[in-house]
Amino acid sequence: MGLSISFLSIIMMMCLLFPDLNVVVKSATTEYTTLIYKGCARQQFSDPSGLYSQALSAMFGSLVSQSTKTRFYKTTTGTSTTTITGLFQCRGDLSNHDCYNCVSRLPVLSDKLCGKTIASRVQLSGCYLLYEVSGFSQISGMEMLFKTCGKNNIAGTGFEERRDTAFGVMQNGVVSGHGFYATTYESVYVLGQCEGDVGDTDCSGCVKNALEKAQVECGSSISGQIYLHKCFIAYSYYPNGVPRRSSSSSSSSSSSSSGSSNSDPSTSTGATGKTVAIIVGGAAGVGFLVICLLFAKNLMRKKHDDY
């Protein structure tokens, strides 16, 4: 009976010592795993033999596996009658570890949000995945898939001039950055990225198109995101200055993501969360070790008393 009470006490002690550990760890990933949008084909694929499901599962496995090594990967799987092409891409400032954490969520989300459709695209804040069954109708790389604009507007303050200058800097930056660029100009943070297999010239054209859409669609809104089929851009204005953050991105290069990345206001909370998670996790490990030693000591004492 004493042993059971001791074990229960240990469990209660762990709950009291680390009640927010799970919350802290989650906060470290939410900045790149938030769902932005989904795109699902209306047609479900007919799969009486299960070949499509097998091909899709194999493709998902391949994409998730590659996300530990690179931020962009495209593959084709299946047979001549069940060909499926799929790809993933992570935001250019994510480390390989964060890229994997982001991409590994996408297969389940795709199945949950779209089911067994002949084409699917799921975009999170840090990565996206898409697949198409052979023969699916193609769309223009300039096609707008999704947009979101901030609710606050600041017309007449010189914001639009600063934003447009930042846009110009970013358009040039994605070329020198070979598909990814992020920077800050006079309190305006901008980020642009093209799909990994898009050349520099086409990338510049796609980003230019997205920036023009942002000017029209979002007007004087202090923030906005425009997602085209082959690229996306995002911007945020901070009147009091863009918050600083410590860099958590990997320095390793990838086929799709390189170039400059300055302070990203959208990830400042996430970077802090990671740091806190590491500290709290370390403390939890030490605390758990101490508790295990105490438990072992009590166990040995009980055995000694029994004799």
Swiss-Prot record:
Keywords: Cell junction, Cell membrane, Disulfide bond, Host-virus interaction, Membrane, Repeat, Signal, Transmembrane, Transmembrane helix, Transport. This is Plasmodesmata-located protein 2. Modulates cell-to-cell trafficking. Belongs to the cysteine-rich repeat secretory protein family. Plasmodesmata-located proteins (PDLD) subfamily. The keyword Cell membrane applies. (Microbial infection) Interacts with Grapevine fanleaf virus (GFLV) 2B-MP. PROSITE patterns: GNK2 (PS51473). The gene is PDLP2.
